[in-house]
Amino acid sequence: MNRNKTMELLLGDDVRALYEQMDNGESKYKMIADDGSYYCRTAASREGAWQNSHLHLHVTEHYLVQTGWIAYASYEGQSILHLRIVTEGHHIVVHPGVHHNLYMSAGSVIHTIKYGMNTASDWTASPELDRLTQSLSEYEILQKGS
């Protein structure tokens, strides 16, 4: 997923604010500290869409659903896909080393907190999980999700 628009502002105390408009229509409003800690408010577009599958080597991610619902997909090798539907007011924590992806339903809003040793090289693509998730329709997601 590429970024269409980016705007950045230095807030002080080694913290910067960043706005990104993603190719899938999501709007991301981020606060990032020089130590790698990170907060992001993500607003989905008018259509549901998958993000890009990935894993982190050292970062823990905490996703909280404010509005709507998301599907959390994880991968355990041998092409075993796990799907979980996360609804308003609920959250999920993703630990380092877990291949994962999110499907954001239309109009959903989530908050993401990242912490741990967050470096530019910590994000690693997971094409294996993309192959299992990107073609799933919203209907299939809701049928397979728990």
How should each PLM-predicted stretch be described?
Residues 53, 72-73, 94, 99-105, ...:
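Short beta-strand His + acidic residue motifs that chelate non-heme Fe in jelly-roll/DSBH
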Residues 30-32, 51-57, 74, 83-84, ...:
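Short histidine-centered beta-strand/loop micro-motifs
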